[in-house]
């Protein structure tokens, strides 16, 4: 064992409790044995260094340190759990148990429910004061069922139903229905802002367990998508037969006007409805090529040299010419015909007529009667400008690879300068 250098110098403060060896002293070896009985030193050995008369034998002991220190104390010291601080009647350490040990604290589930209800109240207050769209659904928790009492109607659906009611000259029923929806929405908002015990229980049940959306509150109908004509929409069923058509149900056409009448736009809906008398749209199959196409094949899509090439030639556009000759005289934008290809390069329907040009050979082959993309209200009906009608500066701009800022021609280019 290592000899204590401080003992040799007479400065060891631990005496027999030293970990190092004290030569000549009883209990040497650093075993930290209990201190021997102190005896008064003899006259001849007052300044000696032995076990009975050590100068620093009763110095600071390790066990004499207090258990709790300002620096945190020892590791085995009793510490109260976090959150048990009692500001009213604290113990000597400043931490203690609650004043009422028999009071049962709120569980985590109850805290979550309280926080959820507070969030719902705050959301509906913001919804009401911000002026957001009323006819929408609301769920306070992600991927949870919507709270009952609200209906989902888009502005486009309301606009469509307005036109349907306008056609049937029954706008008063439309206004009454919308006003009733608004009043029901406000009543539901007020219920959520002023929650009662029964309302809280039903609300938590809706959010947690989920409710059957078959019979939502306020009679909005049995379907998730509310409809003005369905039993859920607040409309008097005996008012008119056209009110029953005020619905948002999915159909092959975007909507179907009342029987025996013409749609607001002079025809059936553009997206896939069937033809009717007085229709300004000559589409007989669903738009964008979803129906059975006409006899248009890839053989007509060729790069044969044109005889009188122009963009007004057949097949360049899939729009029928009836857009410029509707019964009302107005210009409407019909859908793409399914008889043409996606880009419109193909043989058009034989029922369409040319708007800008007489029948000629198609740019990419195939002949027939042309259809046009734009209406005939433009000042310049020609899609191309002959060379002799162009100024020198304009012709230079068309022949250059890039236009110069401020010198871009306002006329169409000559057909000779177009490359495919």
Swiss-Prot record:
GO terms for molecular function: zinc ion binding. Residues 25-111, 323-345 are annotated as: Disordered. It comes from the Eukaryota. GO terms for biological process: mRNA transport; nucleocytoplasmic transport; protein transport. FG repeats lie at residues 14-15, 82-83, 95-96, 218-219, 220-221, 228-229, 265-266, 271-272, 288-289, 345-346, 364-365. Keywords: Glycoprotein, Membrane, Metal-binding, mRNA transport, Nuclear pore complex, Nucleus, Protein transport, Repeat, Translocation, Transport, Zinc, Zinc-finger. It is a peripheral membrane protein. Residues 365-420 are annotated as: Interaction with GLE1. It is found in: Nucleus, Nuclear pore complex; Nucleus membrane. InterPro entries: Nucleoporin_NUP42 (IPR051767), Znf_CCCH (IPR000571). A zinc finger (C3H1-type) spans 1-25. The keyword Cytoplasm does not apply. Residues 42-67, 87-102 have a biased composition (Polar residues). The keyword rRNA-binding does not apply. GO terms for cellular component: nuclear envelope; nuclear membrane; nuclear pore; photoreceptor outer segment. O-glycosylated. The FG repeats are interaction sites for karyopherins (importins, exportins) and form probably an affinity gradient, guiding the transport proteins unidirectionally with their cargo through the NPC. Probable component of the nuclear pore complex (NPC). Interacts with nuclear export protein NXF1. Interacts with GLE1. Able to form a heterotrimer with NUP155 and GLE1 in vitro. Interacts with XPO1. Required for the export of mRNAs containing poly(A) tails from the nucleus into the cytoplasm. This is Nucleoporin NUP42. It comes from Mus musculus. The gene is Nup42.
């Amino acid at each position: 064992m290592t000899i204590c250098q401080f003992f040799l110098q007479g400065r060891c403060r631990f005496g027999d409790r030293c970990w190092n060896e004290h030569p000549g002293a009883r209990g040497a070896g650093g075993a930290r044995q209990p201190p021997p009985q102190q005896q008064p030193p003899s006259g001849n050995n007052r300044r000696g260094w032995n076990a009975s008369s050590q100068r620093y034998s009763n110095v600071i002991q390790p066990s004499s340190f207090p258990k709790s220190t300002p620096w945190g104390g020892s590791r085995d010291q009793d510490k109260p759990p976090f959150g048990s601080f009692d500001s009213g009647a604290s113990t000597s350490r400043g931490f203690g148990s609650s004043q009422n040990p028999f009071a049962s604290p709120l569980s985590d589930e109850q805290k979550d429910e309280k926080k959820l209800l507070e969030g719902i109240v705050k959301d509906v207050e913001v919804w009401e004061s911000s002026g957001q769209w009323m006819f929408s659904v609301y769920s306070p928790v992600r991927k949870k069922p919507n709270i009952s009492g609200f209906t989902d109607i888009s502005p486009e659906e309301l606009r469509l139903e307005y036109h349907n009611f306008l056609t049937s000259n029954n706008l008063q029923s439309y206004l009454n229905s919308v006003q009733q929806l608004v009043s029901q929405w406000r009543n539901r908002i007020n219920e959520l802002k002023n929650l009662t015990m029964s309302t809280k229980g039903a609300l938590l049940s809706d959010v947690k367990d989920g409710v059957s959306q078959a019979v939502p509150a306020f009679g909005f109908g049995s379907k998730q998508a509310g409809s003005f004509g369905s039993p859920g929409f607040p409309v008097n069923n005996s008012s008119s037969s056209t009110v029953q058509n005020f619905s948002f149900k999915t159909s092959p056409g975007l909507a179907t006007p009342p029987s025996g009448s013409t749609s607001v736009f002079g025809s059936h809906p553009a997206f896939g409805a069937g033809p009717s008398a007085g229709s300004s749209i000559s589409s007989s199959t669903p738009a964008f090529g979803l129906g059975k196409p006409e006899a248009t094949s890839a053989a007509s899509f060729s790069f044969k040299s044109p005889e009188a090439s122009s963009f007004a030639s057949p097949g360049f556009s899939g729009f029928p010419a009836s857009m410029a000759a509707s019964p009302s005289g107005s210009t409407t934008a019909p859908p793409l015909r399914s008889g043409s290809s996606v880009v419109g390069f193909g043989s058009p329907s034989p029922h369409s007529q040319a708007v800008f040009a007489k029948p000629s050979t198609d740019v990419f082959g195939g002949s027939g009667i042309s259809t046009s993309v734009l209406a005939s209200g433009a000042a310049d009906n020609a899609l191309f400008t002959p060379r002799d009608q162009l100024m020198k500066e304009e012709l230079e701009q068309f022949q250059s690879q890039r236009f110069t800022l401020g010198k871009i021609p306002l006329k169409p280019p000559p057909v000779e300068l177009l490359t495919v």
